[in-house]
């Protein structure tokens, strides 16, 4: 009953000072919504396991080499690990790549994501089908034309409960549907929720490959997930797998030398993305912590003002025998109620924001919407974290005001205060304002650094011109073309597109720049080069035609480009970039020089040198790169590029029509090079948006905190201000005095924030592009922004009191 009486009394006090209460709850709701969103993202990316039974028993298995921090596993090694380990009940495998194909069922067709998996994929994960069955043991040993549908795709097909036994057709390959996964199963990787799974034994057939890649030990294509036996720890499993790695290295030194198995806890992130996700989450949580810190400082300042307004009540209670512990408890109850109100509002705001975030589906140019399966919605972990946050915030915001307001020298501390800067309470209030301003400055500096990084990325010399380039991408093999038919299709596609009015140039390539992968990695040795005398160099490459360079505006620096004479049976020639020429033939003319491709023991001759560019990622360092002729290196997947005389989107339909005339059944996607290059900036822009949101929150909190501090400090000095006016001081003089004192506090906070910003910049600079250790332009812009906010806030807060009747101020002070 005593506690309930205290709660009712605190609620009456907060209701009486409703303006202060509203500002405090608003500040905490904003900050705690940021905390809820930040922790939910962290929880979804790194804490929440796959939605399968006993997920803690699952570990992801990959390999490393001296030159690769992450690598897949070939099929023979997978079988060896699966059959010879002693720590796993079973081990599954799946290719890291997932692909899009039209899936035809009952005369209706829709593009879907499809993926090959080992026959034990669903059994290892513990996934029971909603209908039918999954794959059976032995399906990997012989091609088995079966398919398992995802719940969402089954719903799109009409949700037929008797669908098991019926067929779907993918690129003229018929598969029998054997089952449907439950709704709760969303795959093993966020961005790769397949619509259809088929056995690994069918992969070569599905891709119309003459040779099964599983027989090639150089194809490290697979990821593995193992389920630990009961009682087995991860260190024990790692030791067992690394022992098997040594056995494989001894048996197959050509492909497995120095290749070591590694394991990590299975999450919904690709293994090679976990470290980046941890860094991004750490930065996000650090920003959230700063925003919360600013909000706590703001509310603590407001509670100091509330304690000042309650000074007579607290004096009377102390005089009547209330202990200091009782006074502190009641003041902490006030702050806890404010934190609870802010926490409730913050949780609702976070829930609404996370609901929208869960529905977010990024669009990949040329391929459509990426079906992310990240569930950001709060779960029990987020709810517990938010409840703990309410308790911590209540303690953090109420402890300092409680200790101060219940001090033994209460009468001197709480009565008759005039000068803001000259009292103990004024110093505490100023310190809290400095903290808010410093935190806001640090967060705004972070926003500025992200903006500077994005501007630098947008100004990067890509090495090619993306403007006015329309493109089509198609898989000739998936469209039913043999290699001979595909080779004859190359010139037909070029000729058809070249006849379109407004098309200036047509080029072809097997991959796009900035695609996130290296096309083909070639192991080469250059005769006479120290760089490759001990170990072959790994050089990325792409196959292009003779018009590729002119279509994309890539400058020719030396030699020639490919010609019609460079046919399939002619000596293999390559064009290299400038960095490769400088690295392997320094001070020499590389034209006519030869190198040996170890992958196929093939001798190649350099015939031309072109300018450097960006090949895999927009923020990558300069790298050697080489080009093969499409006539000499056939590729089924090609990109047809057209340099147009205007907006390239207007040429996509004519290009599509031209190809449809060649083959009405041809399946392809359309996109523009500008859209593609802009997509490479998607993540930096998303990071900028997120940091800007938090920066805006910190700025609002700092402005609200500064307004409240000035408003309440001036209200406490109304007697002094009234006397000054009565003695002849003009309102302008009072304004200058208040502004001067406010600017001293703000300037100190900005200086502290800039110092913190320099430290933060050093910590995150590796995640930014082209950002100097100290970006003075960013720091100056933030300082000016904070200065402008100080002037406006101080004027708005002090104006009502400066216009008050001085005699009334003296009489009622």
Language model region names:
Residues 99-100, 114-135, 145-282, 355-361, ...:
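Mid-to-C-terminal secondary-structure elements
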Residues 42, 49-99, 219-225, 457, ...:
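Membrane-proximal extracellular/periplasmic loop immediately following the first transmembrane helix
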Residues 38-41, 262, 300, 336-410, ...:
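Small-residue-rich transmembrane alpha-helices
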Residues 295-339, 409, 705-746, 750, ...:
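Interfacial "coupling" helices/loops that link adjacent transmembrane helices in transporter permeases
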Residues 1-22, 269-273, 302-329, 333, ...:
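Alpha-helical transmembrane segments of integral membrane proteins
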